[in-house]
């Protein structure tokens, strides 16, 4: 009984630690990070003859493709849009941007260091003076929400029909991947909490049964967590390979990778699976040992 209680206590401690790490991962924003400092240094060093890096603080305007004769409409189209704005605004003005020669080179697209999680995408503070100035002036926002709902892209009127359809389909698939990631992470946390409660109840009632049930719940939570983490990795790869590449892709000298939040999620997965294996295998091992000792006593008699 003492060994069984010790095993239950160890598995319960591991599951609670795993739950804390998973909740930390869910509510923090360092799942994926990009560092553009090396890209900026290369552009400043090798692209000094061009005006590429000046575009980081230069506003772009809606340029009408055809003069419709409507002065009010043309004036409305001249609203300034910064090149570091959201992807939808860059897509809106993609022809004007290409016409100005801003995206002819990799240095023409202004890139800033970012970190993102399940709910927000933010710019690093204090890493790039340009984006800090833009945020201070109110031109850019420090953080933007990650979309989990599909909205009709009414701003894509300046884009060819085939490219518009491609963007819409990619957006739809990406939203599905995001929903799967968030949904399975939520289920993993809920099942893990239920398993911890069942394991705690095992100290007072039917320890063998509750230990087995909690182990199965921990393994189920591990499956959910594995699905969500793999889906998140797929969504990141899918997002970086979207069209048009000058909006969604990253140059080769931009450092990007997973952050400490997803590391917490992977550690949580390991602890969850370990506690589940302990809780499910120990009852079988103890039962087998008891049967062997009983058989040995009967044979000796």
UniProtKB/Swiss-Prot annotation:
Sorted UniProt keywords: Endoplasmic reticulum, Glycoprotein, Membrane, Signal, Transmembrane, Transmembrane helix
Pfam families referenced in this protein's UniProt entry, alphabetically: Claudin_2 (PF13903)
Annotated membrane topology: Multi-pass membrane protein
Residue positions the entry lists as glycosylated: 162
One cellular component term from this protein's GO annotations in UniProt: endoplasmic reticulum membrane
Cytoplasmic side: 205-215, 280-301
Topology feature Extracellular, residues: 26-183, 237-258
InterPro entries: PMP22/EMP/MP20/Claudin (IPR004031), T178A/B (IPR039625)
Top-level taxon: Eukaryota
Signal peptide: 1-25
Annotated coiled-coil segments of the chain: none
GO BP terms in the entry: negative regulation of osteoclast differentiation; regulation of cytosolic calcium ion concentration
Transmembrane segments: 184-204, 216-236, 259-279
Subcellular compartments: Endoplasmic reticulum membrane
Alphabetical list of PANTHER family matching this protein: TRANSMEMBRANE PROTEIN 178A, TRANSMEMBRANE PROTEIN 178B-RELATED
Function: May act as a negative regulator of osteoclast differentiation.
Family according to the record: Belongs to the TMEM178 family.
Protein name: Transmembrane protein 178A
Annotated source species: Danio rerio (Zebrafish)
């Amino acid at each position: 009984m003492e060994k069984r209680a010790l095993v239950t206590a160890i598995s319960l401690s591991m599951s609670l630690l795993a739950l804390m790490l998973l909740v930390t991962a869910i509510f923090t924003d360092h799942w994926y990070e990009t560092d553009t400092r090396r890209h900026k240094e290369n552009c400043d060093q090798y692209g000094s003859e061009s005006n590429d890096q000046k575009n980081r603080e230069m506003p772009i305007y809606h340029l009408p493709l055809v003069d419709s004769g409507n002065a009010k409409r043309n004036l409305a189209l001249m609203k300034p849009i910064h090149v570091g704005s959201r992807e939808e605004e860059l897509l809106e003005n993609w022809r004007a941007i290409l016409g100005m020669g801003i995206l002819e080179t990799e240095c023409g697209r202004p890139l800033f260091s970012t970190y993102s999680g399940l709910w927000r995408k933010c710019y690093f503070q204090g890493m790039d003076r340009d984006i800090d100035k833009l945020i201070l002036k109110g031109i850019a926002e420090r953080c933007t929400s990650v979309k989990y709902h599909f909205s009709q892209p009414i701003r894509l009127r300046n884009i060819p029909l085939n490219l518009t359809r491609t963007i819409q389909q990619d957006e739809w698939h990406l939203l599905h991947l995001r929903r799967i990631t968030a949904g399975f992470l939520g289920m993993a946390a809920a099942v893990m909490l239920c398993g911890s409660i069942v394991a705690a109840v095992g100290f007072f009632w039917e320890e063998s049964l509750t230990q087995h049930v909690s182990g199965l719940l921990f393994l189920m939570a591990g499956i959910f967590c594995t699905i969500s983490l793999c889906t998140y990795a797929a969504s990141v790869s899918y997002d970086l390979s979207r069209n048009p590449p000058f909006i969604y892709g990253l140059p080769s000298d931009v450092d990007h990778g997973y952050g400490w939040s997803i590391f917490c999620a992977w550690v949580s997965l390991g602890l969850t699976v370990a506690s589940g294996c302990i809780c499910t295998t120990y009852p079988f091992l103890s039962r087998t040992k008891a049967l062997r000792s009983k058989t040995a006593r009967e044979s000796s008699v």
